[in-house]
Amino acid sequence: ADLIQRRQRSEFQSDIKGILYTVIKKNPDL
């Protein structure tokens, strides 16, 4: 169970990085 939680957390972090990346690309002023 611990391994699954760790994997979900890493996937969640990568999703956030992807979202932030697209947001920054759409708003270069930031």
From Swiss-Prot:
The keyword Oxidoreductase applies. Keywords: Chloroplast, Oxidoreductase, Plastid, Thylakoid. It is found in: Plastid, Chloroplast thylakoid lumen. GO terms for molecular function: oxidoreductase activity. The keyword Oxidoreductase applies. One of its GO terms (cellular component) is chloroplast thylakoid lumen. Its EC number is 1.-.-.-. Its main location: plastid. Belongs to the peroxidase family. This is Thylakoid lumenal 29 kDa protein, chloroplastic.
